[in-house]
Amino acid sequence: MTRWQKVYEDGSPVRAEIVKGVLEENDIPAVVLNKKESVYQIHGQYEVMVPQSDVLIAINIVKNEITF
């Protein structure tokens, strides 16, 4: 069973999907978890998760190759 770890979070689903796409372009599997409250959509975040084995590389990509 693969353990997943958060490498990015944001209130915007678009930014989370962009981060996911960049990670996947670099052969890092990624998923977006919607942690938003389902009723009012004002609380919570979108989290980008990667397998634990890819965390260091993913964090490096997020910090150095992605700007918003």
Regions found by a protein language model. Give the residues of each.
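Acidic/polar low-complexity segments and flexible, solvent-exposed patches
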Residues: 1-68
